[in-house]
Curated annotation (Swiss-Prot):
Biased composition (Gly residues): 11-27
Gene Ontology, cellular component aspect: cytosol; EARP complex; GARP complex; Golgi apparatus; membrane; recycling endosome
Keyword Protein transport assigned: yes
Coiled-coil region: 111-142, 265-287
GO-annotated biological processes: endocytic recycling; Golgi organization; Golgi vesicle transport; lipid transport; lysosomal transport; protein transport; retrograde transport, endosome to Golgi
InterPro entries: Vps51
Stretches the record annotates as Disordered: 1-39
Name of this chain's protein: Vacuolar protein sorting-associated protein 51 homolog
Keywords tagged on the record: Coiled coil, Endosome, Golgi apparatus, Lipid transport, Protein transport, Transport
Presence of the UniProt keyword Coiled coil in the record: yes
Function: Involved in retrograde transport from early and late endosomes to the late Golgi. The GARP complex is required for the maintenance of protein retrieval from endosomes to the TGN, acid hydrolase sorting, lysosome function, endosomal cholesterol traffic and autophagy. Acts as a component of the EARP complex that is involved in endocytic recycling.
Biased composition (Low complexity): 1-10
Length: 787
């Protein structure tokens, strides 16, 4: 308890010291208690806002008695001893921090005091030196003033003598002007120095012309310069002058005050003659133009880039130099206006453009597109430099020339794509028609289709990459409005991509629409099938991919011309595919029908013997349709079939089918039965679905085979209707029909179509039979199974 009281008294003493600090009393080592309190304790605002707590040892309202009373009442003896030890440690730590803070601040204060004392000593020494410097400057100023006053008269006399000497020099130089002019204006000398000398002396001589001596000097100088002007005019007419020498000659004549309008005319005349000679040199490299176009032109000796380089470095560069010289020589002078330079330059550039057009027309085939783009780029850059000097010298014509060259190259790429596609078709036809060794299969239709499609698409992508060179960022003319909008849309997208796709669809459709020329082989059915699949693939994916790729490489402007929508192209491709597939069905159906027609027309149906086998032509029909099924299945999906009945493979003709008529009614057929049978067949037609023979074919294998079977059986029906049959002829038709039913129903989308057509064949045969006695169904089945 004594230790707690001692700690409490110590704390109270601290509180008293703080109070003493506030009033200015207390011991010296307690003075920093206030700053420590402000540093470690709460801020004034927090202390004002907090509720006064006399038991808070760190608070401003701490009361030792209240604190001790609270501690003694709440804590045990052990806790009191621990609290006393803690307070002792905190007090010692605070004292140590206070002493450290005092020592650090004391050292800084001592260092600052020493620095200030040293600065005072240094400033005293500098003040003494500045006083000495001021006194010395005053003495120097006084001495300088005395010297200037003593030498003022001499300086005035010296200036007068210098002026007289300068005047004498000028007079001497004026007297020497005629001699200098004569020496420098002589032939082969330096006329530029003579002009410079005469220009400096001319104003003085004219000003003092009223003096006889100066008049004589002026007259002699004028005579010398007149002779120089005559020699310069003679030199101006020399055809060997280059543009720089021509400009210097005209400039010297203008300095001699020759008439500007005459010099302007001669300058343009001489410049025009030189430029015409350069154009003639370019034209000499070109073959003579043939208006009829019948004569074959030889290939050019140099490439287009070399031709443009020579034209740009010679003609365009000289024209730019002459235009700049004309502006510097005659700008603002009388007689040089009225657009004379613009008209002069426009005439020459028009002829240069014509020569370049003729050279571009000599580019045969595709050549190197990058070379053409570089040539057009250099031409446009040089032309742009000329147009900065002469805006009216044919800017539109130059841009139009570049645009025409780009369009012509795109048109050639279109023709190249068309030729490439026709070549691929020729390869496909050759692969389809090539004889194959026994036991070795040729390339399948999927492989041929993949090769054809990938080759054409790869060629088209390569063409787009070549055409993209015209819109590259490093090409100067790519910034023209035409190449940002119209070229991308009309020339590339519409003129190349869309035009090629439409041409491809028309070409493919032409195999179905246009009849084969006399003597020319018709398109093989496999080619029709392959082209139909190709057009269908274009409609599904290829067209959208090509258009997307084109729009990415050649982005159209938002306000550009209207473009062909993708769905319209897809509709054309689908229409071509539909026409090709329909034609394929007609061709294959006609081939099978031709076999059936010949087999019916060449047989004696009245005198035929009792059937013992299925005719070979029926087996051939089944084999051909099976082969067609395999062929179509390579390129098209299976398709949807109508639900088949359980006895599809066992059906016979409905008219003579024992499965449909009870056995007890079979003997009722007599020679008078055909009328009843025909009537029964017609009644059945009223309740059956109408069979459309030439309906549009769907893009699947089942629909294609159904169309071929319908054409074949319809042909068989029409041929049977035109023949007269005996009993065995009817039975042979019955056997053949049952055989076809056994094998053809599985190829059709709906077996009822096959059944209905075969029923009509049977009814027609019975109607045309003289003795309609059918064969037993069991015998028919036995013959067909054996066959």
């Amino acid at each position: 308890m004594a230790e707690v009281e001692a700690a409490g008294s110590g704390t109270e003493t601290g509180g008293g010291s703080e109070s003493g600090n506030a009033t200015g009393s207390g011991s010296g080592w307690r003075r920093p208690h206030g700053p420590l309190q402000r540093y470690y304790g709460p801020s004034a605002a927090e202390a004002a806002e907090a509720t006064p707590d006399p038991a808070d040892i760190n608070g401003p309202h701490f009361d030792p008695e209240v604190f001790l009373t609270k501690v003694r009442s709440e804590c045990r003896l052990g806790e009191l001893l621990s609290r006393e030890a803690t307070l002792g440690r905190e007090i010692r730590a605070l004292d140590s921090d206070m002493q450290t803070l005092l020592y650090e601040n004391y050292n800084k204060f001592i260092s600052a005091t020493d620095t200030i004392r040293k600065m005072k000593v240094d400033f005293r020494r500098m003040e003494a030196e500045m006083d000495d410097l001021a006194s010395n400057m005053a003495a120097i100023s006084a001495s300088s003033a005395r010297v200037s006053a003593a030498l003022q008269d001499r300086h005035r006399r010296g200036a007068q003598l210098a002026g007289v000497q300068a005047l004498l020099r000028k007079l001497q130089s004026l007297v020497e002007v005629p001699g200098r002019l004569r020496r420098w204006a002589a032939p082969g000398a330096d006329p530029a120095r003579a002009l410079h000398c005469y220009a400096r002396a001319r104003a003085v001589l004219r000003h003092y012309r009223h003096l006889p001596s100066f008049r004589a000097i002026e007259d002699e100088s004028h005579s010398i310069m007149a002779e120089l002007a005559q020699r310069l005019r003679a030199r101006l007419r020399d055809d060997t002058l280059d543009p720089k020498e021509l400009t210097e000659c005209v400039e010297m004549l203008l300095q001699l005050e020759e008439p500007p309008e005459e010099l302007c005319e001669e300058f343009l005349s001489q410049a025009g003659a030189r430029l015409e000679a350069e154009l003639a040199a370019l034209e000499a490299e070109l073959p003579p133009s043939d208006p009829s176009g019948t004569a074959s032109t030889p290939p050019p000796a140099s490439d287009i880039l070399d031709f443009v380089d020579r034209g740009s470095s010679a003609f365009v560069s000289n024209l730019c130099l002459l235009a700049a010289s004309y502006r510097s020589l005659f700008e603002g002078r009388p007689g040089s206006g009225d657009g004379r330079l613009e008209a002069f330059a426009s005439t020459l550039t028009t002829r240069y453009f014509e020569l370049l057009e003729r050279r571009l027309a000599l580019e045969r085939g595709l050549g190197d597109t990058s070379l053409l783009v570089r040539a057009l780029d250099r031409f446009h850059r040089r032309l742009r430099a000329l147009l900065e000097l002469l805006p009216a010298a044919g800017a539109e014509a130059g841009a139009a020339l570049v645009a025409r060259a780009a369009r012509e190259r795109v048109a050639r790429y279109l023709r190249a794509l068309q030729t490439f596609f026709l070549g691929c078709l020729g390869d496909v036809r050759q692969a389809l028609a090539a004889p194959r060794p026994p036991g070795k299969d040729g390339p399948g239709l999927p492989d041929l289709l993949a090769t054809l499609s990938s080759s054409v698409l790869g060629q088209l992508k390569a063409v787009l990459a070549y055409v993209q060179l015209f819109t590259a960022r490093d090409v100067a003319f790519a910034s023209l409005p035409y190449f940002k909008g119209e070229f991308c849309v009309e020339a590339v997208r519409e003129g190349l991509v869309v035009a090629f796709v439409r041409w491809l669809c028309r070409t493919a459709r032409g195999f179905a629409d246009s009849p084969a020329e006399r003597g020319a082989p018709a398109a093989p059915p496999a080619l029709l099938l392959l082209l139909a699949r190709l057009c269908l693939d274009y409609e599904a994916t290829t067209i959208s991919y090509i258009l997307t790729l084109t729009d990415e490489q050649f982005p159209p402007e938002d306000t550009g011309p209207a473009v062909t929508p993708g769905p319209a192209l897809c509709a054309e491709a689908r229409g071509a595919a539909q026409r090709l597939l329909d034609h394929y069905v007609q061709v294959q159906g006609a081939a099978v029908a031709q076999m059936l027609r010949k087999s019916v027309e060449t047989r004696d149906w009245l005198g035929t013997v009792e059937p013992r086998n299925v005719r070979a032509v029926m087996k051939r029909v089944v084999e051909d349709i099976t082969a067609i099924d395999v062929q179509v299945g390579q390129l098209f999906e299976e398709g949807v079939r109508r639900a088949q009945s359980s006895d599809s493979s066992r059906r016979a003709f409905s008219v003579y089918s024992s499965s449909r008529a009870p056995g007890r009614y079979a003997p009722s057929y007599t020679p008078s039965a055909p009328m009843d049978t025909h009537l029964l067949s017609n009644i059945q037609k009223l309740f059956s679905e109408r069979i459309d023979i030439f309906s549009p074919v769907e893009f699947n294998k089942v629909s294609v085979l159904t169309g071929i079977i319908k054409i074949s059986l319809k042909t068989l029906l029409e041929c049977v209707r035109l023949r007269t049959l005996g009993r065995f002829g009817l039975q042979q038709v019955q056997v053949d029909g049952h055989y076809l039913q056994l094998y053809l129903w599985r190829f059709a989308a709906d077996e009822r179509v096959v059944q209905g057509l075969l029923d009509e064949v049977a009814a027609s045969a019975a109607h045309r039979c003289l003795d309609p006695v059918p064969m037993e169904h069991s015998v028919v089945e036995l013959i067909c199974e054996r066959g």
